Each structure stands twice: as C-alpha cells, then as structure tokens.
Amino acid sequence: MKASSVVVALASLASAHYVFPSVTYNGKTTQDWEVVRKTTNYQSNGPVTDVTSQQMTCYQLAPGNEGATLLDVTAGSTIGAFRLAFTIRGKLADNQLFKGYNAKASVSHPGPVNFYMAKAPSGSITNFDGSGKVWFKIYNDGPTASTFISCSASLARVDIYAPGKTTLNVQIPRCLADGEYFLRVEHIALHSASSVGGAQLYISCAQLRVSGGTGTYKPNLMSFPGAYSPNDPGLVVNIYYPVPQNYKSPGGDPLVC
C-alpha cells in the first residue's frame, strides 16, 4: 500500500497559544475548518484548563459539525508531519508549512501531544458530538528528561517533543473497522502545570472516513471529559525543579494492532 499522509497544521501566536484548523492528505491541504470542527478558541487561541469540562471533547464552538466535511483516508496510512505554522499579529506568516515553507521556529512550551480517535456509533459523524466512552488513543509523543532540563536550565524556547523537532508522523491503525471517525489532536503545555488547573490543553477534532481496515481491533474506550483527572500526574508536574526524570502522558498507552 502506498503511504499517504495527513498534516495537522498548528497556528501559533507569539504568546504560544494556538489552534489546529486544517489537515493535509496526499499533499493537499484543506481550508481552515473545512474538515476540522471549528473550535471555541478559533479567534482567541486560548487553551482548555478544566479537564472536567465539556470542552475536553473537541473544544467545539457550537453543537453540530459547523459545516465541516469528511476527509477520506486509508487505514494503515500515515497521518504524518504534524507541523508548526505560526500566526503573527493575526496574519498567517510565510513560514507556514502548508504554504510550502518550512517552520523556522518552535513552540515555546514543552508537553506531550496525543492523538485519539472515536468512531461514530451510528455510522454517520454528522450528528455525532463525541460524548460517551467512544475514544481510544492511537499515538502519544511526550517530552523527555533532557527537554525538561533544557527548559529548566535556561527557560529558553524548547520544542513540544524534543529540541529541533517540528514534525510528527502518526499512523491510522490498520486494524480499525471502516467507518466515520473523529481524529482528536491534543497538545498539553506543561510550563505552568505545577498546580491543579495549570496545564494548558489545545484540542481539535478532524472528521475522517476510514476505509481498508481489518476491523479486528476491539478497543478499551474512554470518554472526554472523564479520561483525565485534575490531579493526574501527567497534568500536575513541576518541570523546572526538581527536573522530572520520568513523565507519562495522561490517557494511557496508545493502540497497538
């Protein structure tokens, strides 16, 4: 099978707040909010800080799909190159990867990025809001001790995952059943996470139609909200001192087919 990729474009303000409004598949980038449900922070770029709130599902602006369409993808293909696209003074800068330029900066806050999926129970995602125990993790990439040490020592800018890293490849599990799914991307910024409610979560949900899956996976499902506790050690952590030597992202381990 020929590998194909989806790029989740991240737009960031100088404040390091950001949104995930578009994806790219087979080299073609969608318009903002074309296949991603518009989020509450589409103008403010602000985070979710209450993990018990309904915003944890898809951080959606309004009920319904806000006119978002479906993107057809193949199970086993790569959802690849999670890349950075910065917004400056509200205008898209020329270093956006989905404009064909490489990102020349990195997000300033360390923390894990998680990808989850949820299958629309009725077969159609149009009226699906992502509520209930329907979610499973397909990937997580988190900061290492060296990332935290770099941040602690100099308070300098560090990447989400590791210094210099601006891309992330994620595979749609081959063992999924065919159908319509949410792909939920979530970055957890930990720079202020030393107390409950300090972690900042940036969330979006794209709508995918998956085909070519084997249908053999029977996942253990979770809900958003519900999967995370405000006191989860993956959400309440002082990354500066003492520097964490081990960090585990909330939500458990990702799916392995």
Place the predicted regions along the sequence by residue.
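A glycine-anchored, Pro-Gly-centered beta-turn/N-cap motif
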Residues: 172, 177-179
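Peripheral, solvent-exposed domain-edge segments
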Residues: 2-113, 117-167, 190-257
